[in-house]
Regions:
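PLP-dependent aminotransferase-like
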Residues: 1-11
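ALDH superfamily catalytic-core signature
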Residues: 4, 21-27, 31-177
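Short acidic active-site motifs
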Residues: 14-15
Length: 178
């Protein structure tokens, strides 16, 4: 029926300030942002209903029969790379883990490293750019700290130094795909 569904666009602050008890919010994103939304004074005071999907742990799994040179192997490399670089990996549906049979680890590492090395990082308004910045300096530091920690615990696949295009490093928060 008319009015059963409304889509209102604007900044989150403006939207949450204008919610009423009859409204419901569906949010997909980080648990931290969901907590901020849930605790917004207007959301609490008006008992706004919320549906939250937060911090997904999406996985890519490579089967032992998907060997280098196969279509499945190529698709796995393409999709893992795409998930790492689209929106700089900052989307709730991004792959967070890739499970690879030990026998295929060297092949996957080499193929993924080669693909990531070709990733152009910079201002996403430039058509040649395939990976933009992370959201802010705090996130950039968190990601870099996590990378540094992981380097002490695991084998890292590095995309090399990012090839920055139309990027202002004083304003943008760029990280090489890792």
């Amino acid at each position: 029926p008319e009015g059963a569904l409304s889509l209102v666009c604007g900044s989150a602050r403006e939207l949450t300030d204008n919610l009423t008890a009859q409204d419901a919010v569906a949010f997909t994103g980080s648990a931290d942002t969901a907590a901020i939304l849930r605790n917004h004074p207007n959301v609490v005071g008006s008992s706004v209903r919320m549906n939250v999907e937060a911090d997904s742990l999406n996985t890519a799994i490579l089967g032992p029969d998907a060997t280098a040179g196969s279509a499945e192997f190529a698709l796995f490399i393409k999709e893992v790379s795409r998930e790492m670089t689209t929106k700089a990996g900052q989307k709730c549906t991004a792959i967070r883990r890739a499970f690879v049979p030990k026998a295929l680890m060297d092949d996957v590492a080499g193929a993924l490293e080669a693909r990531l090395a070709g990733t152009v990082v910079g201002d996403p308004r430039n058509e040649t750019v395939r990976m933009g910045p992370v959201i802010n300096k705090s996130q950039q530091k968190d990601v870099q700290d996590a990378i540094n920690q992981l380097k002490t615990e695991a084998t890292m696949i590095l995309g090399g130094d990012p090839k920055l295009v139309d990027a202002d490093t004083d304003k943008g928060c760029f990280i090489a795909p890792t």
